[in-house]
Amino acid sequence: MKKLLVTLALGASSFSAFAITPLWLRDVNISPDGKEIVFCYKGDIYKVKAAGGEAVRLTSQDSYESNPVWSPDGKQIAFASDRFGNFDLFIMPADGGTAKRLTMN
């Protein structure tokens, strides 16, 4: 009985540690041609080939960027950012570069 309680206690502590580990990878979106993927990781937007490889960071602001969405032609990426205090919509070239603010929230 004592062995069972120790096993259960260890299992519960392992599970609770896993449950509070933050999931930094989110907002995954596949390009219209299916060749590339954009995603958010720790508040920045990254792009990677769908076939695999090293991800390229597209944003590097102190702000939090999220919800990247491809334009229908795959040439631009729209996303939300709190660069100016509140979340606004921005658009940038799919290969990175200067983002243009679309809304003034």
Predicted regions and their residues:
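N-terminal signal peptide c-region/cleavage motif recognized by signal peptidases
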Residues: 14-16
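Sequence signature of WD/YWTD-type beta-propeller architectures
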Residues: 18-105
